[in-house]
């Protein structure tokens, strides 16, 4: 990282499934009060169901958003619908749908990029998102699924942040994932 980004901290949230339990937004807000960070990223799955109404998830996100400090960037997950995008962006959360943004600090720049979830709609476009990234700059890719790791590496991204595996759905002692819900190495799902 450029020296200007020493001590720069990202808060990475994923798989919030905000409409799964009415008590969840308040619990999340309580945890958010205890952390310090410069920028927040959310790697999808704002809602619990993969189809149907999404108003409850957006209402819960509206409760949480005032407690997220700094800029907030996100990608959609396999539970989310593009129909949610206007509601998410109305909350001042920037969705990165096969696009990137520069993040500047102290005269230096890193790039934050996001791709669409590869599962249902299969509209993730690595060529488009990586096309304008300077190879000498640090680039971070947001992807809901860690299964994109090979594409991310070939596209030249320095870091991939993803969710989807819920830390490995079922883990043995020591954090060894038995079930990952992803077609990638288990070590990528922790």
Residue ranges with predicted function:
Residues 5-12, 18-190:
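Soluble catalytic domains of enzymes that build or remodel membrane lipids, polysaccharides, and related
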């Amino acid at each position: 990282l450029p020296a200007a980004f020493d001590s720069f901290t990202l808060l990475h949230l994923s798989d919030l499934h905000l409409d799964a339990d009415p008590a969840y937004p308040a619990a999340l807000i309580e945890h958010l009060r205890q952390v310090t960070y410069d920028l927040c990223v959310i790697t999808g799955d704002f809602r619990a169901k993969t189809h149907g109404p999404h108003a409850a998830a957006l209402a819960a996100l509206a409760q949480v958003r005032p407690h997220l400090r700094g800029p907030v960037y996100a990608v959609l997950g396999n539970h989310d619908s593009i129909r949610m995008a206007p509601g998410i962006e109305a909350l001042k959360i920037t969705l990165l749908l096969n696009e990137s943004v520069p993040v500047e600090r102290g005269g230096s720049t890193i790039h934050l990029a996001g791709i669409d979830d590869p599962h249902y709609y299969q509209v993730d476009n690595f060529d488009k998102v990586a096309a304008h990234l300077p190879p000498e700059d640090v680039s971070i890719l947001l992807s809901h699924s860690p299964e994109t790791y090979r594409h991310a590496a070939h596209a030249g991204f320095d870091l991939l942040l993803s969710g989807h595996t819920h830390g490995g759905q079922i883990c043995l002692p020591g954090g060894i994932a038995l079930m990952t819900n992803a077609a990638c190495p288990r070590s990528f799902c922790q």
